[in-house]
Design a protein with these regions (language model features):
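Phosphate-handling catalytic cores of nucleic-acid transaction enzymes
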Residues: 2-458
Length: 458
């Protein structure tokens, strides 16, 4: 059974989350340092963006700022990068894109500045290459000038081959920012059938990638890729994401879904964002960007490895044992697969949360401590519930009219006898309904005890 440590910090965290739930937000904003909590609150109050979207975008931005500079180690040989695949789900006009623009602005500014530097360096390079070697030597220039590379964090639509080249030039990491995620996964088969999807499956696990370019003498070798993905998707096209092999190969299970309970259209107001809020956010991300890191003899980043304190590791193991019991009781393989991916994500969350606290001066980054683990558990529970909600939507989309009518008529909690009666009133035989009920445990329904069930999304 899960036990929670009682301390002043955890009490404050609970109070913060309770106040947020009263406003219709389920995202556990308390996982962030107080400085970032204030940024989220001010952006929400000023622009009326859903808090879930703002918080998820900020979580991703911090992960991207860390990139390959730090890793979390749970035990010898098991290390995790802060790679996130996040989808913001909502109706058209639900302000999904604007929170992303706010969170990613420090990277946009950095990329713009670096592009200016690159353009000047490229012009100089082209000028030198137009000279002969003798002319370069006579002018005191290098005889064999090196072609400049563009430093960046953000990418949009790009092929795996092009992405590998960009990543080779930016080894600390990248972020694929897709305003419409549907364009991302619909392009998976545009060149080689399934190869792009396999590329992203490998990247998620930070597996070494090798890209063999046409007409090139050498391959692009990325020892430890770091590419996070974030974007938006409309609720009505979620089923597109689950098409093909993306359900069976576990691709969809790697995506963290953010779907606010309240999706009202934002009301305009006269409130202005305090001038220091954007600057505070820039300062936090800039602290991550400007971190120094070691390079080995081959020019590869030597990341700082964060271990867990003993009490933090003990708490994490306790949570995992309880989570494993959920898996053992679960009869739906799709749900089990989701739970298994969350066991990977919780370690990544620990790394991101610890570094977020460090940027705000609330802790050091020598170890991952107990408070960070407690907060990572809350975040994992949030994404677990979101994943179950998405599975429920996917299953509802696949229902025929008879099945949908029965689901709609079932009360939030029901007995087998009640359900069979409703099914028969709608023309479904008892045996057919029993099979339908059993097939959808964990997606549409939850078994409370023998003969008693509840709807996952009443």
């Amino acid at each position: 059974m899960d036990t929670y440590s009682i301390n002043p910090a955890s009490i404050i965290d609970e109070a913060v989350d309770l106040s947020m739930r009263l406003t219709g937000t389920d995202f556990p904003v308390s996982i962030f340092p107080s400085k970032i909590q204030r940024i989220i609150s001010e952006v929400h109050e000023c622009h009326n963006y859903p808090t879930d979207y703002i918080a998820a975008a900020i979580l991703t931005a911090i992960a991207v700022g860390i990139g390959n500079t730090h890793l979390a180690q749970i035990k010898q040989g098991w290390i995790e990068s802060p790679i996130l695949y996040i989808a913001l789900i909502g109706r058209p006009g639900a302000n999904k894109s604007h929170p992303l623009s706010f969170a990613m602005k420090p990277f946009l500014d950095y990329d713009y500045q670096q592009n200016q530097v690159f353009e000047k360096a490229l012009a100089k390079y082209d000028e030198l290459m137009s000279m002969s070697r003798k002319e370069r030597a006579d002018n005191g220039e290098e005889q064999f000038p090196q072609e400049p590379v563009r430093k960046r964090f953000l990418i949009s639509d790009v092929t795996p081959e092009g992405l590998s080249l960009i990543h080779a030039q930016n080894k600390r990491g990248l972020c694929l920012w897709a305003d419409e995620l549907s364009a991302w996964f619909k392009n998976f088969n545009r060149y080689n059938n399934g190869s792009e999807e396999q590329f992203w499956l490998s990247v998620f696990s930070a597996k070494t990638t090798i890209s063999d370019r046409k007409n090139a003498k050498s391959s692009i070798f990325i020892k430890r890729p770091y590419i996070s993905v974030i974007g938006t998707i409309q609720k009505k096209i979620l089923s597109e994401l689950a098409k093909g092999e993306r359900s069976s190969n576990g691709f969809i299970d790697r995506i963290l879904f953010v779907m606010p309970n309240l999706q009202q259209k934002a009301r305009w107001n006269d409130k202005e964002l305090p001038e220091n809020i954007e600057q505070e956010w820039n300062t936090i991300i800039d602290k991550l960007i400007q971190q120094e890191y070691a390079l080995n003899e081959f020019g590869e980043i030597e990341p700082q490895i964060l271990l867990f304190t003993e009490d933090a590791k003990r708490r994490l193991y306790e949570w995992q044992h309880h989570f494993s019991e959920l898996c053992d009781r679960e009869t739906n393989d799709t749900i089990v697969s989701i739970y298994c991916k969350l066991e990977i994500y919780i370690i990544r969350f620990c790394l991101i949360i610890q570094l977020a606290r460090w940027t705000c001066g609330e802790c050091d980054k020598t170890y991952i401590d107990l408070l960070t683990v407690e907060r990572a558990i809350k975040l994992t529970e949030y994404f677990k519930e979101s994943a179950l909600s998405v599975q429920n939507i996917l299953n509802e989309n696949a229902l025929n009219s008879q099945q949908q009518a029965i689901v709609n008529l079932l009360p939030p909690a029901f007995t087998t006898t009640q359900a069979i009666q409703i099914a028969e009133q709608n023309g479904m035989k008892e045996r057919t309904f029993q099979r339908f009920l059993n097939d959808n445990i964990g997606t549409l329904f939850r078994k409370e005890k023998h003969g008693e069930y509840s709807k996952i999304n009443p």
